[in-house]
Amino acid sequence: MGFKCGIIGLPNVGKSTLFNAITQSSIPAENFPFCTIEPNIGVVEVPDFRLNELQEIVRAKKVIPTTLNLVDIAGLVKGASNGEGLGNSFLSNIREMNALAHVVRCFDDNNITHVDGEINSTRDAEVINLELIFADLETLNKRKEKIEKKLRSGDKDLANEFSLIENCIKTLESGNFVNISDYSNKEDLKIIKSFQLLTAKPIFFIANVSETESSRKNLNDLWDYAKKINQEVIEVQIKLEEEIASLDEQDKKDFLELEGIEEPALNKIIKKGYEILGLDTFFTAGPNELRAWTLKRGSLAPQAAGRIHTDFERGFIKAEIISFEDYISFGGEAGSKENGKLRLEGKDYIFKDGDIAHFKFNV
């Protein structure tokens, strides 16, 4: 399994159209707010050219890529944290995500209504961000009240948690998101994560653009805003993605080249998701199955083994490792071994992106 990415944003910005194009689903994408009521979930394969190159050598009976769970969450509006629009139920859906893709409308189209009557990319982005902040403030203040009562009764063990809550509240009240990387202490980090804060999730903008001058201005404004709050922007012509979704792979590739687009939206989203979540991919290769596995960057060999089965982690002995480059250069496992490129690694080995692994374990 890869990761779960929630598509969020105001109503009518292109979230469901993007979801449809990427997952090739046919959920409603109507021109009125809240046409998405329940979150729509699509599982898409993560494109990885390395699987194709490995399969040229391995010739496995089955090739299994890792996957991305894409979730189309109903449009949020100003006041959602107070129950406006479809309210808090959708803020709770966001809590389940590993990462958030925030779609912002940068295109002009008189046929598609805007909830505020006019397009302003910075304001639109800020509306959603503020709702996430308000929701987190409510969560933290409720927790703070409970802890205050226990502290007054003499429970000093909660003093550190109380201090962390106050720090987070201070950050949010200044208009900033809570940044997990600001907390290096493992115990502090564990407590912060237990709050399940929306603003602590990795998030990036998807600018839904067109080729007009006004769209370019809206995009530039969004970039300026994103830089101020340390977020990043991916440009996507969602309408174009919708048009090419039904084409076969070669026609899609030809069309993208003709339009001067380097890669489809799915690839951009996955790359950015892997980057902000700190994820890598390793492979297992054999005659029956060639498979990609997603792993948190910096994971040790037993943790990688545990991605396959908990018994592998519990009884881990050694891992046979070949880098992707060596595996390809020397024509597979046998050639890599003959040239001294197969390594035996122990429990302290930190997995690298592209490693081909075979685990030895005993339970």
Report the location of each language-model feature.
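Conserved G1/Walker A P-loop phosphate-binding module
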Residues: 1-113, 122, 147
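C-terminal-of-GTPase-core extension/linker across diverse P-loop GTPases
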Residues: 2-8, 13, 19, 148-350, ...
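Residue-level signal for pocket-adjacent positions within structured domains
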Residues: 22-32, 39-41, 46-49, 53, ...
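Short, intrinsically disordered, mixed-charge
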Residues: 24, 56, 92, 130, ...
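Conserved nucleotide-binding/hydrolysis micro-motifs of P-loop NTPases
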Residues: 24-25, 50-51, 75-77, 105-111, ...
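Amphipathic alpha-helical transducer elements in NTP-driven molecular machines
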Residues: 34, 48-51, 64-70, 84-97, ...
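Short, glycine/charged-enriched secondary-structure capping and boundary segments
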Residues: 83-86, 115-118, 219-221, 248-250
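Long, charged N-terminal accessory/stalk domains
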Residues: 90-194, 234
